[in-house]
Structures are given as structure tokens and as C-alpha cells.
Amino acid sequence: MEGNIVSGKAVADNITNILATCISDLKVQHNLTPCLIVVLVGDDPASQLYVRNKQRKAEMLGLRSETMLLPSTISESSLIEKIHQLNNDDSVHGILVQLPVPRHIDKNLIINTIDPKKDVDGFHNENVGRLFTGQKKNCLVPCTPQGCLYLIKTITRNLSGSDAVVIGRSNIVGKPMACLLLGENCTVTTVHSATRDLPDYCRRADILVAAVGIPRFVKYSWVKHGAIVIDVGINSIEEDGVKKFVGDVDFAEVNKIASAITPVPGGVGPMTIAFLMVNTIIAACNQSGIHGFLEKYLDL
């Protein structure tokens, strides 16, 4: 048996086409063009690449997108002032501070300086609190877990009663992913580096989400026959003198037992960017008093 390889790129491309129509109609019907500002502090090459990809996607859709480039030496207080200026600019609907930031800057302070209505990453304490108290419809949800859930629902619509295991407990993926799965009436277990007998937990999973940041961590013997496996990891390794990206799952082996599995690259990554665009549209509509517009185009 080989699993169904779930192309996040193909699903994200379909979402992109839908969003382009939505944005075009939003302009015509409401004279509204969603605007995303990405704040990039320093010149980290990986961050620059991520930002370029986000901006390219936004422009393809017809969003207004700009990058605010700031030196790595900027003071924390100056960065906070820049964010306040964006918070107070009614033409800006989404603000994203590309992580990581330099060590002298308090990441959590910066995240919570962003107006929660413009926090398209979904990391502000207010958005986190709303998600964890069952108010998904009244907050901006982190993009990667949102993309993962959408992928899972392309495989099976009814998740109620499923056993789901999330490997990883980060604020960015693990915790919100568990929360979203709970919202679908799954029985959710979160495992992590201190979990005893971790493979035993994984073997119970109908849905297994790996977000641990360790190359090929999840082995064939850990996976239930017919499980859905979502691989969030993207790890750079060198193999036979060649650099490549691999996930947190041993794809070649686990693909033999899973009913569906996401590849790396081309799995979760494109979905993260697609849902950043989704959040930007939601933020723009909410700030403009336009409710339920995106839901006419995309089933969230």
C-alpha cells in the first residue's frame, strides 16, 4: 500500500484562484483592497526569502503588500513606535513581523504590540485566548495550523471522534493545532520531547501531525495503518554530499502505511502562505464592517 500524497501546493493554488476572485469582487462591490505590511528586521537570508514569497503571492492575488525593511540595530522602542504607526493607519489591514527578530528585541512584546485586529499571524495573546476559548470565528487563527486543518478536510470531512496526535507543543503550530482539532470533536493528544513511550501514542492516531523540527523523526513503526499524516517540519540536511529539505516524517517508509501523507517540500508550506492571505482578507473585511464576505467563496 502507498498513501495518497496530498499536494499542499495544488490545494494552495486552488485557494489562490478563489481568493483572487474574492479580492476582485471586494474591490468592485466595496471599494476595498486589503493591505498587508510585512516588517523585516535585519538581513537574515531565510527571512528575506520567506518575505519575498509572501509578497509575491499577495501581489498575484491583487492585495496591496509592502515590506518595511529595518536595520538589525533598531532599538526595541523604535520598532514598537513603527508598529504603533501601522496600527493607527486605517489603510493597513494586516501587520506581520517576520520572525526571528534580533536578540535584543523581546519577541512577545513585539507580537503583542500589534493591534490584534491586524495580527494576521494570529500570535497576539487576544487571538490566542479567543481560539483557546472556542471563539475561532472571532479571532485570527495561526496560518500553519489553519492550513493543516484545511488539508485534512480535503481528505475527510468528518473528523468527529477521530484520535488525533500532535507531535510538538509550540505556540505557532502545536498548541493551536491541538485546539483546532478539538474544535472538530477529535480526541487530541499532544506529545513532546518529555513524553514517555511517544511511539505508543503515535500508533493510536487516526490523524498524526508532526511539528517537532527533527529530520525524519516519525518512523514507519510509529504509524497506524491507514492514518492521515501531516508533516509540518522542514529541515535542511546533507545526504550523499547533496543538500536537501526533508520533513519530520520518514516519508518514503511512512508512505507505505499511511492512507494520506503530505510531502516536504510542497505540502504544508504553501498552505501557510495561502492562509496568510486568507487572514489578511478577513482582517480587512472585519475592519471595514464587511462580515461573511470570504465565506461566500471559501469554506473555512
Swiss-Prot record:
EC number: 1.5.1.5, 3.5.4.9
Keywords tagged on the record: Amino-acid biosynthesis, Histidine biosynthesis, Hydrolase, Methionine biosynthesis, Multifunctional enzyme, NADP, One-carbon metabolism, Oxidoreductase, Purine biosynthesis
InterPro entries for the chain: Aminoacid_DH-like_N_sf, NAD(P)-bd_dom_sf, THF_DH/CycHdrlase, THF_DH/CycHdrlase_cat_dom, THF_DH/CycHdrlase_CS, THF_DH/CycHdrlase_NAD-bd_dom
Catalytic activity: (6R)-5,10-methylene-5,6,7,8-tetrahydrofolate + NADP(+) = (6R)-5,10-methenyltetrahydrofolate + NADPH; (6R)-5,10-methenyltetrahydrofolate + H2O = (6R)-10-formyltetrahydrofolate + H(+)
One GO location term (cellular component): cytosol
Molecular function GO terms recorded: methenyltetrahydrofolate cyclohydrolase activity; methylenetetrahydrofolate dehydrogenase (NADP+) activity
SUPFAM superfamilies for this protein: Aminoacid dehydrogenase-like, N-terminal domain, NAD(P)-binding Rossmann-fold domains
GO terms classed as biological process: L-histidine biosynthetic process; methionine biosynthetic process; purine nucleotide biosynthetic process; tetrahydrofolate interconversion
UniProt cross-references to Pfam families, sorted A to Z: THF_DHG_CYH, THF_DHG_CYH_C
Binding positions (NADP(+)): 168-170, 193, 234
Pathway: One-carbon metabolism; tetrahydrofolate interconversion
Quaternary structure and partners: Homodimer.
Job of this protein: Catalyzes the oxidation of 5,10-methylenetetrahydrofolate to 5,10-methenyltetrahydrofolate and then the hydrolysis of 5,10-methenyltetrahydrofolate to 10-formyltetrahydrofolate.
Homology family: Belongs to the tetrahydrofolate dehydrogenase/cyclohydrolase family.
HAMAP family found in the cross-reference section: THF_DHG_CYH
Protein name: Bifunctional protein FolD
Organism of origin: Ehrlichia ruminantium (strain Gardel)
Top-level taxonomy: Bacteria, Pseudomonadati, Pseudomonadota, Alphaproteobacteria, Rickettsiales
